Regions:
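An acidic, gly/pro-interrupted, aromatic-rich
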Residues: 6, 13, 24-171
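Helix-loop-helix junctions that connect adjacent transmembrane helices in secondary transporters/permeases
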Residues: 172-177
């Protein structure tokens, strides 16, 4: 990759194109064989859940909203600037109910095992039924126009949703759904 980057005169788009079109990057998470050694032999990649901070940042990015944070320690440096993302939270005392529910580490010990990456029923219910997520979708400036489009513009709305959420165009099969 180093030689390719230099040969392309440090063109990052060229480097991204090279990586994204490689077979390594396009591997499936499904093992090509029945045995359990697919992961060990790098024949597939293991799926893992997004960390709490990354997930809320993605939801805020999609909806155009921001998360509200609070701190149990009332000190001046617990104020969060509007443009700061959850992944940049340096102080573990600054948190939100979403971060706690989705397994953000309290950073008491500094061990990786403090973070919970398990998917729980409470997390599923929060994503499916919570007023928090509903307010982000319905109240977000990015989603408002897409929600209120008329039936005549249905195909255009679906395309915009796919581009906003998945950064790709929908397939023909997805349009039919």
């Amino acid at each position: 990759l180093e030689h390719e980057l230099v040969a392309a005169r440090y063109d990052l788009k060229h480097l991204f194109r090279l990586i994204l079109n490689s077979t390594t990057y396009q591997r499936s998470h499904i093992s090509p064989t029945e045995d359990s050694q697919g992961e060990e032999n790098f024949a597939c990649y293991p799926l893992r859940r997004l960390e709490a901070e990354v997930l809320i940042d993605a939801l805020c990015q999609i909806s155009g909203t921001r998360e509200q944070y609070s701190s149990i320690i009332p000190e001046p440096y617990t104020f969060m600037p509007e443009d700061q993302r959850s992944v940049a939270l340096a102080d573990a005392s600054i948190t939100s109910p979403f971060l706690e529910k989705f397994g953000r580490s309290s950073r008491d010990t500094g061990l990786e095992s403090d973070r919970s990456d398990r998917t729980t029923a409470a997390q599923r219910l929060h994503l499916l039924n919570s007023s928090h997520i509903r307010q982000k979708i319905e109240g977000g400036p990015k989603m408002q126009p897409l929600i209120h489009w008329s039936r005549e513009k249905n195909e255009e709305a679906v395309t915009e949703l796919y581009l906003t959420i998945l950064s790709r165009f929908p397939t023909e099969e997805e349009f039919e759904i």
